[in-house]
Curated annotation (Swiss-Prot):
Pfam families documented for this protein: OMPdecase
Residue spans crossing the bilayer: none
CDD domains, per database record: OMP_decarboxylase_like
InterPro entries: Aldolase_TIM, OMPdecase, OMPdecase_AS, OMPdeCOase_dom, RibuloseP-bd_barrel
Protein name: Orotidine 5'-phosphate decarboxylase
Keywords, sorted A to Z: Decarboxylase, Lyase, Pyrimidine biosynthesis
Binding site for substrate: 38, 60-62, 91-100, 213, 232
Pathway, per record: Pyrimidine metabolism; UMP biosynthesis via de novo pathway; UMP from orotate: step 2/2
Active site, renumbered: 93
Record-linked Gene3D superfamilies: Aldolase class I
Cited PROSITE patterns: OMPDECASE
Catalysed transformations (reactions): orotidine 5'-phosphate + H(+) = UMP + CO2
Amino acid sequence: MNTYKTYSERGQQHPNACARSLFELMERNESNLSVAVDVTTKKELLSIADAVGPFVCVLKTHIDIVEDFDHDLVAQLEQLAKKHDFLIFEDRKFADIGNTVKHQYANGIYKIASWSHITNAHTVPGEGIIKGLGEVGLPLGRGLLLLAEMSSKGALTKGSYTSESVEMARRNKDFVFGFIAQHKMNEHDDEDFVVMSPGVGLDVKGDGLGQQYRTPHEVIVESGGDIIIVGRGIYGNPDQVEAQAKRYRQAGWDAYLERVRLHKK
């Protein structure tokens, strides 16, 4: 199964351009860490991005919560992505009909498609959402993740919702390269979906607001996830940002090496 191959092997054979770039970058930087930078000022976002940049493969943003957003922020984020060799993932969670999301992705004040390598979408509206986003993203070499499962307590993303989301991804492998999910989604030898898993923590099990945390070992070795998404565990203490990024990067990479070892033929 492709889940258990090395990132390098998976990158060489992946049908999606964005996924190929991502796997190559992960192997090159020895990182499967994504930091979710959920802060509300341009200064904080750029400061954290620069501090964690050397240790991540993906920087995850919520650009619409930044109160002083401007296009200089985007330009500086793009510069940091080049400087530190990471991809940008705007966690937009599109959830409307195809024609609407097409404009939300390409236009408006954020113009997400112009700078974000990866974005994501709910599958609630049906397959049209993938087609609409793909019209914009495919020509730009972008990649889409579908929300198959969420890490919050009581989430409705389970059962038939999850299985239908996987079927939609299978029909759109040119643009959809993976999922936001809690475990591996690959069932067939001819598919290789990248799984990014939120809700990762080394020190706590929850946040009192419904978030449930798992360790990198649980996510990658036990559940078959590929990339760990960490937020407050890294930048919650401003004096510890770099140290925590190093710590999570090492924990994630060690878990990946263990998984490869366990499944070597």
